[in-house]
């Protein structure tokens, strides 16, 4: 049986479990498997790119909502500039004043990314990042991981059922 959709995956899990008393918990087993895969999987299919326009004088912009881990931050200028990550403490120590210029470093504070020196002109930043797994549901029947690695979903969900 192919389990290429959430519905088919639930059916396959019910068949493997062969226990009617666990059927109502199958969505929970899938959710628990997704939580673990989100922490541990690092596949090419999870890589994404996002751009952000940095206005003159704007230090912070929102991060993508599906971001799990940043791989690279760059300023799309000529020449291209790859930025270095700094802890928030080091970020403010390195550039203690609000002077403007071309960003050299970035930091993460909550759901935002900050740039120092603060841009003195409008720039475009590109963030290459690993995304969280989009959760399966009755309204989201498939995702990249289920399409490319259905066995990971089956194994992960079954292992949660047997814990």
Regions found by a protein language model. Give the residues of each.
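Glycine-enriched, solvent-exposed interface loops adjoining structured elements
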Residues: 1-163
């Amino acid at each position: 049986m192919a389990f290429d959709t959430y519905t088919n995956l639930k059916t396959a899990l019910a068949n493997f479990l062969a226990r009617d008393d666990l059927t109502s918990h199958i969505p929970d087993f899938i959710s628990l498997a997704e939580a673990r895969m989100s922490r541990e999987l690092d596949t090419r299919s999870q890589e994404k790119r996002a751009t952000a326009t940095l206005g003159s004088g704007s230090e912070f912009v929102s991060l993508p909502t599906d971001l799990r881990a940043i791989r690279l931050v760059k300023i799309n200028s000529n020449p291209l500039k790859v930025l270095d990550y700094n802890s928030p403490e080091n970020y403010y120590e390195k550039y203690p004043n609000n002077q403007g210029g071309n960003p050299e470093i970035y930091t993460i504070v909550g759901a935002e990314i900050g740039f120092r020196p603060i841009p003195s002109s409008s720039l475009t930043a590109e963030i290459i990042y690993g995304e969280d797994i989009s959760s399966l549901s009755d309204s989201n029947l498939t995702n990249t991981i289920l399409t490319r690695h259905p066995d990971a979903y089956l194994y992960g969900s079954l292992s949660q059922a047997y814990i």
